[in-house]
């Protein structure tokens, strides 16, 4: 082997000429204590609140407690390999998530990393998960309807775009079912949906995703999932991440629906973090700022004014109660933050009234302005009839002789309750809801046996679609029942009743 000194010399010269001194300065600290997903780090003097910190092995943490001599940090991933004395690096950025069209149809974790095995999410746009809610000037009052496709809700507890409507009830009362039905009903509208699953079983989330796929709803939906097996910090971050993804679309002038399922588990995760970080506990051991935890999230739902693009973000937070106790700490907090609540009762659920909406306790504080006029016309008497029915039903149990007017009200009420029942995953277009409720409140169902009410409704709507499609079309486009339209609808119902046996 021949050594050529001149060649070696030229290579060394070249290397020296190309050599660039690169000094990378990064602020580092040392782990002084770690355990239970929490690390205390010494030496990060310039650390920001909510800043991402990098632990050995690429695991990220988030600075939550900035104390005099150390930083209390929650670890967003596996922490068993982290030990005392490890070096922690500052990243200089706060927690942010990828946003944009690339996320639609995907299942991601609260950091925006894909969970569905469909490859990486290609987007160059990121948003911080926390941000200040839109101010008074940038907002507009809620005035457009967001149809859920559920008769009991669209008629009596209407939801508008930009509203925050709480869904509250015990476990197994159909809270998630209402949210999923609402998402399915946004098909063929311009609404982008985001379903945030917080602390649920992975199998439950998989089932929800499959249901959405089966109904073609994943084409306009993003699922953000922090399952029960994920670390508490991810459960805490999930709603904010979902909201940040929605805000990107809202600021482009689009309409977004975000479901937080459920915020009770987020509050429990935050309580866990706060206690581990040694923050002082308050009522029910929740930290003092648990109200702010939910208020700063739900205040980000808004209807933007036309100068800001006119987009909207509607929030449907879900809260699980224990044995119907709506006066517990978290339920009362969220009730006071939202613009109304849909209260689901287990007694109604077990009695076969599904969706199990308690119409007396449920309310929508702003949705009335968003309801279409035709629905307002038929639903006004519906609420009254049901209220009178509930009052009289209590007396009727005593079995005393009842006069004709009372009997008529009881008869009408029974049929209205029956009409408001609805199968899961079968949301109904608003014009069909109007026609069905119109028939009920005008007494066309009073002479039918209760068990015939649902078959009557199904056959009647089929008859209307086949023979009088223009009536439904007119209700949908004009949104009002004129005298002429009312008389046409009445004659159509009478014509159908003759054929219905």
Curated annotation (Swiss-Prot):
Q: Which SUPFAM superfamilies match?
A: C-terminal domain of alpha and beta subunits of F1 ATP synthase, N-terminal domain of alpha and beta subunits of F1 ATP synthase, P-loop containing nucleoside triphosphate hydrolases
Which residues bear the site annotation Required for activity?
362
Alphabetical list of Pfam families matching this protein: ATP-synt_ab, ATP-synt_ab_C, ATP-synt_ab_N
- Name of the top EC class for this enzyme: translocase
Catalytic activity reported: ATP + H2O + 4 H(+)(in) = ADP + phosphate + 5 H(+)(out)
Its biological purpose: Produces ATP from ADP in the presence of a proton gradient across the membrane. The alpha chain is a regulatory subunit.
Q: Which NCBIfam families match?
A: atpA, PRK13343.1
- What is the name attached to this protein's record? ATP synthase subunit alpha
